[in-house]
Amino acid sequence: EIVINKALEHRHLVSENTLLREQLAEKFKFEQIISVSEVMEQAINIAGRAAASKSTVLITGESGTGKELIARAIHYASPRKDKPFLAVNCAALPENLIESELFGHEKGAYTGADRMRKGRFELADSGTLFIDEIGEIPLPTQVKLLRVLQQQTFERVGGSETVHVNVRIVAATNRNLEEMITTGDFREDLYYRLNVVRVNVPPLRKRKPDIPMLTEFFLNKYSRENEREIKEISKEAMDLLMKYEYPGNVRELENVMEQAVVLSRGSIITTRDLPMTVRSAQSEPKSPDVMLDGNFNEQIEALEIELIRYALDQAEGVQTKAAKLLGITERNLRYKLNKYGMK
Protein backbone atom coordinates (compact mmCIF):
# COMPACT_ATOMS: atom_id res chain seq x y z
CA GLU A 1 0.00 0.00 0.00
CA ILE A 2 2.86 2.39 0.85
CA VAL A 3 4.51 1.64 -2.49
CA ILE A 4 1.23 2.28 -4.33
CA ASN A 5 0.68 5.58 -2.48
CA LYS A 6 4.21 6.73 -3.30
CA ALA A 7 3.72 5.79 -6.94
CA LEU A 8 0.44 7.72 -7.06
CA GLU A 9 2.06 10.70 -5.34
CA HIS A 10 4.94 10.64 -7.83
CA ARG A 11 2.50 10.44 -10.73
CA HIS A 12 0.56 13.39 -9.30
CA LEU A 13 3.75 15.47 -8.97
CA VAL A 14 4.79 14.63 -12.53
CA SER A 15 1.34 15.64 -13.74
CA GLU A 16 1.52 18.93 -11.80
CA ASN A 17 4.98 19.71 -13.19
CA THR A 18 3.80 18.98 -16.73
CA LEU A 19 0.81 21.28 -16.27
CA LEU A 20 3.02 24.03 -14.83
CA ARG A 21 5.44 23.81 -17.76
CA GLU A 22 2.53 23.98 -20.20
CA GLN A 23 1.19 27.07 -18.43
CA LEU A 24 4.62 28.72 -18.51
CA ALA A 25 5.06 27.86 -22.18
CA GLU A 26 1.71 29.53 -22.90
CA LYS A 27 2.51 32.57 -20.75
CA PHE A 28 5.91 33.19 -22.34
CA LYS A 29 5.01 32.65 -25.98
CA PHE A 30 6.41 35.21 -28.40
CA GLU A 31 2.79 35.96 -29.31
CA GLN A 32 2.19 37.10 -25.72
CA ILE A 33 4.80 39.87 -25.96
CA ILE A 34 2.95 43.17 -26.27
CA SER A 35 4.14 44.99 -29.35
CA VAL A 36 2.96 46.68 -32.53
CA SER A 37 6.09 48.80 -33.16
CA GLU A 38 8.36 47.87 -36.04
CA VAL A 39 11.60 47.98 -34.01
CA MET A 40 10.26 45.63 -31.34
CA GLU A 41 8.73 43.29 -33.90
CA GLN A 42 12.15 43.06 -35.56
CA ALA A 43 13.75 41.99 -32.26
CA ILE A 44 10.99 39.43 -31.64
CA ASN A 45 11.39 38.06 -35.17
CA ILE A 46 15.15 37.51 -34.76
CA ALA A 47 14.67 35.88 -31.35
CA GLY A 48 11.92 33.64 -32.73
CA ARG A 49 14.10 32.40 -35.58
CA ALA A 50 16.95 31.70 -33.16
CA ALA A 51 14.77 29.76 -30.71
CA ALA A 52 14.74 26.47 -32.62
CA SER A 53 18.54 26.38 -32.93
CA LYS A 54 21.18 25.34 -30.41
CA SER A 55 23.10 28.59 -30.82
CA THR A 56 24.02 30.95 -28.03
CA VAL A 57 22.01 34.18 -28.03
CA LEU A 58 23.19 37.59 -26.80
CA ILE A 59 20.40 40.00 -25.87
CA THR A 60 21.39 43.65 -25.59
CA GLY A 61 19.39 46.61 -24.37
CA GLU A 62 18.94 49.11 -21.58
CA SER A 63 17.73 48.08 -18.13
CA GLY A 64 14.00 47.50 -17.96
CA THR A 65 13.47 46.80 -21.68
CA GLY A 66 12.38 43.18 -21.19
CA LYS A 67 15.51 41.17 -21.96
CA GLU A 68 14.54 38.32 -19.62
CA LEU A 69 11.08 38.17 -21.20
CA ILE A 70 12.75 37.61 -24.59
CA ALA A 71 15.06 34.97 -23.07
CA ARG A 72 12.11 33.04 -21.61
CA ALA A 73 10.25 33.23 -24.92
CA ILE A 74 13.31 31.77 -26.68
CA HIS A 75 13.44 28.88 -24.19
CA TYR A 76 9.73 28.04 -24.39
CA ALA A 77 9.82 28.11 -28.20
CA SER A 78 12.85 25.80 -28.31
CA PRO A 79 13.19 22.00 -28.23
CA ARG A 80 14.31 22.44 -24.59
CA LYS A 81 10.95 23.89 -23.49
CA ASP A 82 10.17 20.89 -21.24
CA LYS A 83 13.54 21.20 -19.50
CA PRO A 84 14.64 23.74 -16.84
CA PHE A 85 14.96 27.47 -17.46
CA LEU A 86 17.19 29.12 -14.87
CA ALA A 87 18.18 32.77 -14.60
CA VAL A 88 21.09 34.37 -12.79
CA ASN A 89 21.67 38.13 -12.51
CA CYS A 90 25.41 38.72 -12.20
CA ALA A 91 24.88 42.37 -11.22
CA ALA A 92 23.01 41.24 -8.11
CA LEU A 93 25.87 39.04 -6.88
CA PRO A 94 29.12 40.00 -5.16
CA GLU A 95 31.98 39.50 -7.61
CA ASN A 96 33.59 36.81 -5.44
CA LEU A 97 30.40 34.69 -5.43
CA ILE A 98 29.63 34.71 -9.16
CA GLU A 99 31.86 31.71 -9.92
CA SER A 100 30.31 29.64 -7.13
CA GLU A 101 26.78 30.61 -8.21
CA LEU A 102 27.43 29.53 -11.79
CA PHE A 103 29.56 26.43 -11.25
CA GLY A 104 28.81 25.35 -7.70
CA HIS A 105 31.35 24.44 -5.03
CA GLU A 106 32.66 21.44 -3.13
CA LYS A 107 32.45 21.08 0.62
CA GLY A 108 35.24 23.07 2.25
CA ALA A 109 35.95 25.12 -0.88
CA TYR A 110 35.91 28.27 1.25
CA THR A 111 34.82 29.44 4.68
CA GLY A 112 31.15 28.66 5.12
CA ALA A 113 31.01 26.00 2.40
CA ASP A 114 29.84 23.23 4.74
CA ARG A 115 28.41 21.05 1.96
CA MET A 116 28.65 20.45 -1.76
CA ARG A 117 26.39 22.75 -3.75
CA LYS A 118 25.47 22.51 -7.41
CA GLY A 119 25.67 25.68 -9.48
CA ARG A 120 23.27 27.04 -12.06
CA PHE A 121 24.92 25.15 -14.92
CA GLU A 122 24.25 21.77 -13.30
CA LEU A 123 20.74 22.73 -12.24
CA ALA A 124 19.95 23.88 -15.79
CA ASP A 125 21.32 20.70 -17.40
CA SER A 126 19.44 19.84 -20.63
CA GLY A 127 17.70 23.22 -20.43
CA THR A 128 18.52 26.91 -20.79
CA LEU A 129 20.62 29.14 -18.54
CA PHE A 130 19.92 32.86 -18.81
CA ILE A 131 22.95 34.86 -17.66
CA ASP A 132 21.82 38.45 -17.14
CA GLU A 133 24.34 41.32 -16.97
CA ILE A 134 27.11 39.09 -18.27
CA GLY A 135 29.40 42.12 -18.48
CA GLU A 136 29.72 41.98 -14.68
CA ILE A 137 31.52 38.61 -14.71
CA PRO A 138 35.17 39.00 -13.61
CA LEU A 139 37.92 37.99 -16.05
CA PRO A 140 39.00 34.77 -14.25
CA THR A 141 35.41 33.49 -14.32
CA GLN A 142 35.11 34.49 -17.99
CA VAL A 143 37.82 31.92 -18.77
CA LYS A 144 35.80 29.19 -17.08
CA LEU A 145 32.63 30.28 -18.87
CA LEU A 146 34.43 30.16 -22.22
CA ARG A 147 35.42 26.55 -21.54
CA VAL A 148 31.80 25.58 -20.85
CA LEU A 149 30.75 27.15 -24.14
CA GLN A 150 33.49 25.28 -25.99
CA GLN A 151 33.44 21.90 -24.23
CA GLN A 152 30.34 21.83 -21.99
CA THR A 153 32.57 20.85 -19.05
CA PHE A 154 33.81 22.50 -15.85
CA GLU A 155 34.91 21.82 -12.27
CA ARG A 156 33.09 23.06 -9.21
CA VAL A 157 34.94 25.63 -7.09
CA GLY A 158 37.39 23.74 -4.87
CA GLY A 159 36.97 20.51 -6.84
CA SER A 160 38.86 18.49 -9.45
CA GLU A 161 36.04 16.30 -10.79
CA THR A 162 35.00 17.26 -14.32
CA VAL A 163 31.28 17.92 -14.63
CA HIS A 164 29.61 17.43 -18.02
CA VAL A 165 26.50 19.43 -18.91
CA ASN A 166 24.27 20.10 -21.89
CA VAL A 167 23.09 23.68 -21.44
CA ARG A 168 22.06 26.36 -23.87
CA ILE A 169 23.21 29.83 -22.85
CA VAL A 170 21.22 32.97 -23.44
CA ALA A 171 23.14 36.00 -22.17
CA ALA A 172 22.12 39.62 -21.74
CA THR A 173 23.80 42.92 -21.01
CA ASN A 174 23.07 46.64 -20.84
CA ARG A 175 26.76 47.41 -21.28
CA ASN A 176 28.85 47.93 -24.41
CA LEU A 177 30.85 44.69 -24.55
CA GLU A 178 32.82 45.83 -27.60
CA GLU A 179 34.06 48.81 -25.61
CA MET A 180 34.86 46.54 -22.65
CA ILE A 181 37.02 44.42 -24.96
CA THR A 182 39.11 47.44 -25.92
CA THR A 183 39.62 48.34 -22.24
CA GLY A 184 40.56 44.75 -21.38
CA ASP A 185 37.52 44.13 -19.18
CA PHE A 186 35.90 41.48 -21.38
CA ARG A 187 37.47 38.63 -23.32
CA GLU A 188 37.18 38.90 -27.08
CA ASP A 189 37.04 35.12 -27.60
CA LEU A 190 34.17 34.85 -25.09
CA TYR A 191 32.35 37.70 -26.81
CA TYR A 192 32.38 35.90 -30.17
CA ARG A 193 31.18 32.68 -28.53
CA LEU A 194 28.26 34.56 -27.00
CA ASN A 195 27.43 36.82 -29.93
CA VAL A 196 26.30 34.09 -32.35
CA VAL A 197 22.78 35.47 -32.59
CA ARG A 198 22.25 39.02 -31.36
CA VAL A 199 18.89 40.45 -30.33
CA ASN A 200 18.76 44.20 -29.70
CA VAL A 201 15.78 45.09 -27.52
CA PRO A 202 14.84 48.75 -28.16
CA PRO A 203 14.20 51.22 -25.32
CA LEU A 204 10.57 52.20 -24.75
CA ARG A 205 11.18 55.72 -26.11
CA LYS A 206 11.94 54.07 -29.48
CA ARG A 207 8.71 52.04 -29.44
CA LYS A 208 6.11 54.67 -28.53
CA PRO A 209 3.29 52.91 -30.48
CA ASP A 210 3.45 50.13 -27.86
CA ILE A 211 2.72 52.44 -24.91
CA PRO A 212 -1.13 52.39 -25.13
CA MET A 213 -1.23 48.57 -25.20
CA LEU A 214 1.30 48.25 -22.39
CA THR A 215 -0.57 50.84 -20.34
CA GLU A 216 -3.85 48.96 -20.74
CA PHE A 217 -2.16 45.68 -19.78
CA PHE A 218 -0.65 47.12 -16.58
CA LEU A 219 -3.86 48.99 -15.74
CA ASN A 220 -5.88 45.76 -15.87
CA LYS A 221 -3.19 43.78 -14.04
CA TYR A 222 -2.92 46.10 -11.05
CA SER A 223 -6.64 46.82 -10.93
CA ARG A 224 -7.22 43.08 -10.46
CA GLU A 225 -4.41 42.70 -7.94
CA ASN A 226 -5.62 45.64 -5.84
CA GLU A 227 -9.32 44.85 -6.32
CA ARG A 228 -9.98 48.24 -7.89
CA GLU A 229 -12.65 48.97 -10.49
CA ILE A 230 -10.41 51.06 -12.73
CA LYS A 231 -10.86 50.29 -16.40
CA GLU A 232 -9.99 53.56 -18.10
CA ILE A 233 -7.32 56.22 -18.41
CA SER A 234 -8.12 59.79 -19.44
CA LYS A 235 -6.95 61.17 -22.78
CA GLU A 236 -4.89 63.83 -20.99
CA ALA A 237 -3.12 61.21 -18.87
CA MET A 238 -2.43 59.05 -21.93
CA ASP A 239 -1.03 62.08 -23.75
CA LEU A 240 1.45 62.59 -20.91
CA LEU A 241 2.42 58.91 -20.93
CA MET A 242 3.08 59.15 -24.67
CA LYS A 243 5.30 62.24 -24.27
CA TYR A 244 7.43 60.88 -21.43
CA GLU A 245 10.86 59.42 -22.31
CA TYR A 246 11.01 56.52 -19.77
CA PRO A 247 14.67 56.26 -18.71
CA GLY A 248 13.61 53.10 -16.83
CA ASN A 249 11.81 51.72 -19.90
CA VAL A 250 8.92 49.22 -19.62
CA ARG A 251 9.76 48.53 -15.99
CA GLU A 252 9.26 52.24 -15.23
CA LEU A 253 5.94 52.34 -17.10
CA GLU A 254 4.76 49.35 -15.06
CA ASN A 255 5.78 51.14 -11.86
CA VAL A 256 3.97 54.31 -12.97
CA MET A 257 0.76 52.40 -13.67
CA GLU A 258 0.89 50.43 -10.42
CA GLN A 259 1.32 53.68 -8.46
CA ALA A 260 -1.49 55.34 -10.41
CA VAL A 261 -3.90 52.47 -9.70
CA VAL A 262 -3.02 52.39 -5.99
CA LEU A 263 -3.32 56.17 -5.50
CA SER A 264 -6.27 56.84 -7.81
CA ARG A 265 -9.37 58.18 -6.05
CA GLY A 266 -11.80 57.42 -8.85
CA SER A 267 -12.58 54.87 -11.54
CA ILE A 268 -10.50 56.66 -14.18
CA ILE A 269 -6.75 57.33 -14.13
CA THR A 270 -6.25 61.08 -14.56
CA THR A 271 -3.16 63.28 -14.81
CA ARG A 272 -3.13 63.90 -11.05
CA ASP A 273 -2.66 60.15 -10.51
CA LEU A 274 0.62 60.19 -12.45
CA PRO A 275 3.98 60.93 -10.78
CA MET A 276 5.52 64.37 -11.16
CA THR A 277 8.25 63.01 -13.45
CA VAL A 278 5.59 62.06 -15.99
CA ARG A 279 3.43 65.14 -15.45
CA SER A 280 6.39 67.41 -16.18
CA ALA A 281 6.51 65.95 -19.70
CA GLN A 282 3.41 67.96 -20.61
CA SER A 283 5.46 70.97 -21.64
CA GLU A 284 8.66 71.48 -23.56
CA PRO A 285 11.76 72.30 -21.49
CA LYS A 286 12.02 76.00 -20.82
CA SER A 287 14.76 77.89 -22.60
CA PRO A 288 17.53 79.43 -20.48
CA ASP A 289 16.09 82.90 -21.23
CA VAL A 290 12.75 81.94 -19.68
CA MET A 291 14.31 80.21 -16.68
CA LEU A 292 16.57 83.16 -15.97
CA ASP A 293 13.69 85.61 -16.13
CA GLY A 294 13.58 86.32 -12.42
CA ASN A 295 15.31 85.42 -9.20
CA PHE A 296 16.97 81.99 -9.11
CA ASN A 297 15.83 81.28 -5.55
CA GLU A 298 12.25 82.14 -6.49
CA GLN A 299 12.37 79.59 -9.32
CA ILE A 300 13.61 76.88 -6.93
CA GLU A 301 11.04 77.74 -4.28
CA ALA A 302 8.19 77.67 -6.81
CA LEU A 303 9.28 74.21 -7.95
CA GLU A 304 9.55 72.95 -4.36
CA ILE A 305 6.06 74.22 -3.54
CA GLU A 306 4.62 72.49 -6.61
CA LEU A 307 6.32 69.19 -5.72
CA ILE A 308 5.19 69.36 -2.08
CA ARG A 309 1.59 70.13 -3.06
CA TYR A 310 1.53 67.20 -5.46
CA ALA A 311 3.06 64.79 -2.92
CA LEU A 312 0.54 65.83 -0.26
CA ASP A 313 -2.26 65.40 -2.78
CA GLN A 314 -1.06 61.91 -3.66
CA ALA A 315 -0.65 61.02 0.03
CA GLU A 316 -4.09 62.45 0.88
CA GLY A 317 -2.51 64.87 3.34
CA VAL A 318 -0.52 62.27 5.27
CA GLN A 319 2.86 63.92 5.82
CA THR A 320 4.74 60.67 6.47
CA LYS A 321 3.68 59.30 3.08
CA ALA A 322 4.29 62.62 1.34
CA ALA A 323 7.83 62.80 2.73
CA LYS A 324 8.50 59.27 1.48
CA LEU A 325 7.26 60.17 -2.01
CA LEU A 326 9.56 63.20 -2.01
CA GLY A 327 12.53 61.23 -0.71
CA ILE A 328 13.02 63.49 2.32
CA THR A 329 12.50 63.10 6.06
CA GLU A 330 9.19 64.04 7.66
CA ARG A 331 11.04 66.61 9.76
CA ASN A 332 12.44 68.21 6.60
CA LEU A 333 8.96 68.28 5.08
CA ARG A 334 7.51 70.01 8.16
CA TYR A 335 10.29 72.60 7.95
CA LYS A 336 9.45 73.36 4.31
CA LEU A 337 5.71 73.52 5.06
CA ASN A 338 6.41 76.14 7.72
CA LYS A 339 8.86 77.95 5.47
CA TYR A 340 6.35 78.30 2.65
CA GLY A 341 3.32 78.83 4.91
CA MET A 342 1.67 75.63 3.68
CA LYS A 343 0.02 74.57 6.94
Language-model features: locations:
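Conserved RecA-like P-loop NTPase ATPase core
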Residues: 20, 43, 65, 88, ...
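Conserved post-Walker A coupling segment in P-loop NTPases
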Residues: 32, 45-111, 122-138, 203-208, ...
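AAA+/SF3 P-loop NTPase mechanochemical coupling elements
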Residues: 116-126, 130, 137-144, 155-174, ...
